[in-house]
Every structure is written in C-alpha cells, then in structure tokens.
Amino acid sequence: MAEVECGYKIIESLEVEPHIRFFRIRPTDIKLTLRSVLESLSKNSWIMKFDGGFLKDTFSVRFQSTIDHISSNIIHKEDDSLTSDSAEYVISEIARSTIVEQLDYLDIPLGELIKEQKSGNPGFDFYSMNKSNIILFGEAKYVAAQNAYGKALEQICRFKKDKKDISDLHDIQNLCPEASCNEVCKGNKGFIAAFSSKTTATKILIHNIKKNVNYKELSSHKELILVAVDICKKNDNEKLNIQNNKRREH
C-alpha cells in the first residue's frame, strides 16, 4: 500500500539477528492512517476462503459484530487524532499488515475479528505464519509517555507462561495448517512485539531492547519480530493528539 494512501511509511527494516527482525513505522498523516486501518480491518476476503457451511457463517457473524463495534465506538472515518483505544488498534493492524506485505507471511485477521468475545483479555492480539510454517503470536502495546516495548515483551512472556498461545490455537485452527498448530504445542513458534515508540534513535532503541530480560527469553524461539510505531512523535507537521480513553468493554 502506497504511503500517500495509507498515511504511514516504513522508515527502518533491519535484521537484528538471523531470526529477529525490526521494523520502524512512522505515520505521516494520522487521519489517513486511521482511515486505512479501518479499511484494512474491514476487509472480509479471508471469510470467502471457506466453502460455505457453518464456519463461513460463524466467522461472518463475529467479524461483522466486531467491525460494527470498532467503527461505532473506537475508530470513526473522519477521526484525525488518536485515543488510547484507537492507538492499540493502529499498532496491531499496522504491524500485522506490514509483516504480511513485507515478508509475505500468512494473512490472518486481527484476533478480535475471529475470536468469540469473552470478558477480560482472552489472548494475543494478532497472528501470522512464516515461510517455514511456524505460527507467530503478536501483542501490541501503547504507552503515551514512553517506548512501550517493555510492556509488549512482558505481556508476551506472561501469555506464554499462561499458555495463551496454545489456548489461542482453538481460534486460529481453521486458518492455519494442522501441522503448524501441532508444532506450537511442541514449542516451535515465534512472536511479534508491536509497540508505540517515541523519537529515540533506532540504534539506541534496539540496544535497549536487547538488554530487556523478556527479549532475551523470547529470542530463543524460532522467530521474533519487533515493530515500533512512532505514534508518540510530535512536530509542526505531525501533531498526534493522544488522549486518554479507557477501553470500553465489547
């Protein structure tokens, strides 16, 4: 997707280690960014891959209900600023779509679009699968005052300890090969940490991330992708009005 159409651009794409990649993404027009994220979330072509029957209908109902909620309560077509709610959707969807488009990994919809709605945090935010058929579990975090990589990495490690990756297989089993799901249970999996970032230089940011204890734990897995989204950046041409807005229960 061209920058002029999506309102953001990839400014860094680096290999940290052979199995660890870092992307840095910067919004150039937050109104366009929000619009493109909503449009991306609203694509339902993945549902058409199912050959009719109850699965197609089940996913259609969940998808439409969630999209209606997002478009009515979180991201509106004419929004030109971010809230804490919409920021996490922006981070999740930009990270997910970047990995799909740049690495040609499996296009799996955002977790909230395919999961049965439950109280509390049910698991990972998004998923993909690499060229080796290893499933990747993604988590997005937004913090207004600081780089949020620590929060994202910490949450991933907590979810891993609680075996949320394994429990999430129930939600994505119809979108991934059975063999890949079985490999997750054997420990063969990867993770994606997507997070809001400020103006810290990329070299310093990566250096700090590599010192994080949770990064060290996750780096032992098959693949780790880091996606920094500069939605805390402010200058004369790019004022991102970040407002506090507690997440509403769906």
Model-found features: residue ranges?
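Interdomain/boundary linker segments immediately adjacent to catalytic/signaling cores
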Residues: 1-93
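Charged, structured surface patches that assemble and position nucleic-acid processing machinery
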Residues: 24-29, 35-40, 58, 62-71, ...
